[in-house]
Amino acid sequence: MTSPRKTHPLKKMINNSFIDLPTPSNISFWWNLGSLLGACLIIQITTGLFLAMHYTPDTQTAFSSVAHITRDVNHGWTIRYMHANGASMFFTCLFLHIGRGLYYGSFLSRETWNIGTILLLTTMATAFMGYVLPWGQMSLWGATVITNLLSAIPYIGSNLVEWVWGGFSVDKATLTRFFTFHFVLPFIIAALATIHLLFLHETGSNNPSGMTSNPDKITFHPYYTIKDILGLILLLLLLMSLTLFMPDLLTDPDNYTLANPLSTPPHIKPEWYFLFAYAILRSIPNKLGGVLALVLSILVLMIIPTTHLSNQQSMTFRPITQIMFWMLTANLLTLTWIGGQPVEYPFIIIGQIASIMYFLIITTLIPLSALIENKLLKW
């Protein structure tokens, strides 16, 4: 008799996606990040749901409601810090996941890659709106600075900013709508992640060698479920260590001061995971140019499948391109550092050079390296 998991309509879907899924036998721990991102999303939705039960999206009470969660709600501080540091874990896994895709040529599955880019943008929007909710100084001024970027759009810019604000400044209406979107977007992310998986399972997973793995595949369960559980344990260990021992390591002290529209903080900066994009935005003196560079810093990922000129999929056997990849990694770390520094010499010039290098490596140097390697291998 055939097992119900192979015949039952619902069980069959789960079976084909997580149990009997044919998986390459040689995929490394870099392929764990997808399941870790799923775990992060579940943690964020769960903790966020409990926080929403006690939070009030009103300029008069938002700050004190967060203080109330931390002080008076049973284990409220744990939930709050798990949610705040969970976002850092989420973005760490996201960046590593994208890096893995770049290194091993996973971007050649175009639909999966493009939906992944949309997922990144949606996650960034969600995190930005979430940062506004505690209504501290950095929440208010971060929201003011970033939403003000829309005014760079010709003709409709200023009207668009006021439409987003729901008034003439970031106020109660803005906070309410940001809370609404922050609550809804994670479910949209979950839906997009399902489509991401759907397209991935059409082609199957890539592997470190970049060669076809059709002759040598194994079932996802138990081999990779066990491997994913180990990754999950390590993720939870890191998250709980941050939450319990250093909850404020990655947050801004300014956000413990109630939002005051009459006092501007000396340095307005976003959370660490946005600093690379913020550095690119600040490196261009022109407002519209900066906004375009900011948007392109993420959208540039979508052109990577087109600029792939190598005859090999993966970077495993391509030393010149590997050097370019690690240059890009170092460059992104430099941008992250610059984004947190004040706008003065020498940080301005370092940021400008790093911004140029970021686009140059992705659009020119990596494709050029591929052509050189093709020539050397006489392919």
UniProtKB/Swiss-Prot annotation:
It holds the Pfam family Cytochrom_B_C. Its main location: mitochondrion. One of its GO terms (cellular component) is mitochondrial inner membrane. GO terms for molecular function: metal ion binding; ubiquinol-cytochrome-c reductase activity. Keywords: Electron transport, Heme, Iron, Membrane, Metal-binding, Mitochondrion, Mitochondrion inner membrane, Respiratory chain, Transmembrane, Transmembrane helix, Transport, Ubiquinone. GO terms for biological process: mitochondrial electron transport, ubiquinol to cytochrome c. It is found in: Mitochondrion inner membrane. Signal peptide: none annotated. Its cofactor is heme b. A ubiquinone binds at H201. InterPro entries: Cyt_b/b6_C (IPR005798), Cyt_b/b6_C_sf (IPR036150), Cyt_b/b6_N (IPR005797), Cytb/b6-like_sf (IPR027387), Cytochrome_b (IPR030689), Cytochrome_b_C_euk/bac (IPR048260), Cytochrome_b_N_euk/bac (IPR048259), Di-haem_cyt_TM (IPR016174). The keyword Acetylation does not apply. Heme b b562 binds at H83, H182. The chain crosses the membrane at residues 33-53, 77-98, 113-133, 178-198, 226-246, 288-308, 320-340, 347-367. Heme b b566 binds at H97, H196. It is a multi-pass membrane protein. Binds 2 heme b groups non-covalently. Component of the ubiquinol-cytochrome c reductase complex (complex III or cytochrome b-c1 complex) that is part of the mitochondrial respiratory chain. The b-c1 complex mediates electron transfer from ubiquinol to cytochrome c. Contributes to the generation of a proton gradient across the mitochondrial membrane that is then used for ATP synthesis. The cytochrome bc1 complex contains 11 subunits: 3 respiratory subunits (MT-CYB, CYC1 and UQCRFS1), 2 core proteins (UQCRC1 and UQCRC2) and 6 low-molecular weight proteins (UQCRH/QCR6, UQCRB/QCR7, UQCRQ/QCR8, UQCR10/QCR9, UQCR11/QCR10 and a cleavage product of UQCRFS1). This cytochrome bc1 complex then forms a dimer. Belongs to the cytochrome b family. Heme 1 (or BL or b562) is low-potential and absorbs at about 562 nm, and heme 2 (or BH or b566) is high-potential and absorbs at about 566 nm. This is Cytochrome b. It comes from Saimiri boliviensis boliviensis. The lineage of its organism: Eukaryota, Metazoa, Chordata, Craniata, Vertebrata. The gene is MT-CYB.
